[in-house]
Structures are given as structure tokens and as C-alpha cells.
A protein has these predicted regions:
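Non-catalytic structural scaffold of enzyme domains
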Residues: 1-176
């Protein structure tokens, strides 16, 4: 029986959260449901846009507060790990850690995991597919540099199409 309690913070693109949850269940697939982790999910759809906060400074503190509130909820429920599904949300983590330093021990940093995996696979250069805010602020370039990974951004005129793909990928996939 799997006993770990995992917190998932979603709501930053509902379909990305749905896709992550589906993949998590597939990863733990077994003959018994008792082998799945105890999962607590918080989808705060009312949180302001992370992309607009990064690009225009709109509601930046509200985004930090919203992420912090979700993390606090997870910690109150005694989760052992917290996963933020949204890559762009990782940009705000330093500000979140100033408010909740103990969260750093529980957050599964998906960008660091990506860096470690890419380094193991000896990948020296990757194309970053992410929301405009993460691309403009060079979130992945900055974070993956320590792993020796060079990040290439798509052309700026493709950013809107990429955002649509990120937000609607599950819906689009069902059409084909």
C-alpha cells in the first residue's frame, strides 16, 4: 500500500492539471487502488494570470498570495510533497518561500527535475515550449543553465499559438 500523501496545486490551466493528474494515475497504475498515493488537489481558478503578472506586473502580489494560500492548505493537510503543475508558477516560488520558508522542503521543483533528467540524457540544447511570461522572463533559461542546458525560445509570433496549445491541449487532442 502506498502511504505517501501528495498535494497537487492546479487551476493554472485546468487541462494541464487534468493531464498531469491522468499521468500520475497511470504512473501508479496497479491492480489495487490502494497502491495509489493519497492525493489532495487544489484548483484555484480565481487566481490572477501568472503570465500577465510577469509581463505587466498586474496582480503580482495576488498571484504570490494565491500560490501561498494553496501551499498552506496542502501543508495543513500534512502532505509530504507538493507539486505545482504550472511551470510558470515556479517563477513566483522565491517570493512564496519568503512567506513560507518551510514550503521549500515540500515543493517538487519540476524545473530542477527537468534539468536533472536532461543532464542525465546528455541533452545540451532544448526548445522551450512555455507561456509567454516564462519565455519573456527567461525562467527556463536561467534555471536550466546550472545543468549546462541551453534553452532556445520559439519565435515570438508563435507565443499566442503556444499558449492556446498549453491551455487547450487535452481538448485539441480529442478531436484527432
Amino acid at each position: 500500500m502506498y502511504r505517501e500523501k501528495v498535494g497537487i496545486i492546479g487551476g493554472f490551466g485546468a487541462y494541464a492539471t487534468l493531464n498531469f493528474y491522468k499521468r500520475l494515475l497511470e504512473e501508479f497504475a496497479s491492480e489495487s487502488e490502494r497502491n495509489y498515493p493519497h492525493i489532495i488537489m487544489d484548483n484555484n481558478f480565481t487566481m490572477p494570470s501568472r503570465t500577465r503578472a510577469l509581463l505587466y506586473g498586474e496582480a503580482y502580489d495576488e498571484v504570490v498570495d494565491g500560490i501561498s494560500d494553496s501551499i498552506q492548505l496542502m501543508m495543513q493537510n500534512d502532505v509530504s510533497k507538493i507539486i505545482l503543475v504550472c511551470g510558470t508558477a515556479h517563477y513566483f516560488l522565491n517570493d512564496v518561500y519568503k512567506k513560507i520558508p518551510e514550503a521549500k522542503e515540500k515543493i517538487v521543483d519540476i524545473i530542477n527535475i527537468m534539468g536533472e533528467e536532461l543532464k542525465l540524457k546528455d541533452e545540451g540544447e532544448v526548445l522551450v515550449i512555455a507561456a509567454e511570461g516564462a519565455l519573456q522572463k527567461k525562467l527556463y533559461q536561467t534555471r536550466l543553465k546550472k545543468y549546462g542546458i541551453k534553452c532556445v525560445n520559439p519565435d515570438e509570433e508563435d507565443f499566442i499559438d503556444i499558449r492556446y496549445f498549453i491551455e487547450k491541449s487535452i481538448v485539441c487532442r480529442k478531436k484527432y
